[in-house]
Amino acid sequence: FEDVYYFFKDSMGYDITFLSSQNVGNNRYDIFIDNLPTNYFAITYTTSFINQASTSCGSYIKMRNNYNGAAFQNITEQENIKITAAHEFFHAIQFSYNCYERFWLMEATAVWSEDEIYNEINDHYRYMPSWFQNSAKPIDDESSHMYGSFIFFQYVDEHLGGYETIKNIWERSRSNANSVNDVSFTSINEALESVGSSFSSALNNMRIANRIMSSHPNADPFTYLEAESYPVTGPLEIAQLYFEDQIIEYSQNYLAVNSANYIKLDLVAPAKISISILDGYVDDLFHAIVFKHKDRDAWTIRSGNNFNIDPSIGIDWATIIINSQSQNQDRWSYKTKIESGISEELIVNNTYPNPFIKNENEFISRFISTIDQNINISIYNILGKQIFKHKLVLLSGEEQEFKWNLKNNRGNKISSGIYFFEINGQNERKVKKVTILN
């Protein structure tokens, strides 16, 4: 427990002053060893309020007296004690920040914390198979599902500010604490806004990363460092839609708030895919198609309501992702329609995320060609003035990256705003609108 104490205090910077507040003159935290119920690793109990606003609680921990049961056999007894100490002491910190915070946020971040200090143990993998089989459950579901929701905070940790952002979530929770309202999503959103993101954006990105499930740099920012070690390859796909030449319609009558559906696509001919909302606001749902290119570590992500996919480019797998991203209602229904699409000689990945934030000072788009051709790229500002141009030579079956350093033809940095990309190939012209933010 001393290792855990110093890790959270010194390495991660959490406020540990609650020790002296709850044990005046003692400055020690109470930990007991007890004969706990089967399958309980430990229990953290709250005591009295320790601040004037009555939102911060003292606590103590009961550890079990042995880890011999079947639930603890994946790792050694010493490893069980280590990850349990991390998990439960993080609960003690959480109670001292906001005694009223929701259990899902407490448990998901406590599981996340285990891997921060004891990265080599990986006992938290145990929660992943069930969680990935149940993506249609809300991320804040407070059954055992909430333990697997650590994956959201793992994504935030790896891509949106590291452990400092998780700490900031708890600092916001402490500031927002009250006994009446759910402040978990407000606190998460405030912390993510401080790093140029939001809860909705992070949730959408995590849903994509969960399907790609790779650590390969080509998939960035939809990666996990330990993806290849995870005991899952992706979420459960609730339906498989096979398209050859007949129109297909698939409806889903219930999608809960903060949950997602994954739908497998099996295409043997060019397909036009449309997603329409039957119940709920259009902007409340995020839609994307993710597909992996055959025989290479490359993925394409297209967001929106209407897509054209030509499988002749070579697709290993393709999945529709539909994620609810609003707190304004609690259920949605939608319909997916697949009909004959068009063959494509030039494929330009839709920019995602859009708006694009200039934190990397480089804009990247990918182009795929099914023939040998020259590509001319022109970028225009909102006034219609050309500010940049570039040429690419693409070979049949080749994918190339177009990298733009966000400078105009004169070498000056561009300002935030809306820009239009005109892409002219041998026989096709495409226009993409991109919002770029400082």
Q: Where are the regions a protein language model picked out?
A:
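Signal that preferentially marks extracellular ectodomain short beta-strand elements
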Residues: 68, 308, 402-414
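Juxtacatalytic substrate-recognition/specificity segment
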Residues: 1-102, 109, 119-123
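Surface-exposed loop/edge segments in extracytoplasmic proteins
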Residues: 294-303, 385-391, 429-430
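Beta/coil-rich, acidic/histidine-enriched accessory regions frequently appended to metallopeptidases
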Residues: 175-343
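A glycine-anchored, Pro-Gly-centered beta-turn/N-cap motif
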Residues: 314-316, 398, 415-418
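Acidic/His/Gly-enriched intrinsically disordered linker/tail segments
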Residues: 49-56, 79, 83, 98-160, ...
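C-terminal tail/sorting-segment detector
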Residues: 410-412, 416-438
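Glycine-centered coil/turn sites that cap beta-strands in beta-rich domains
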Residues: 341-381, 389-404, 425
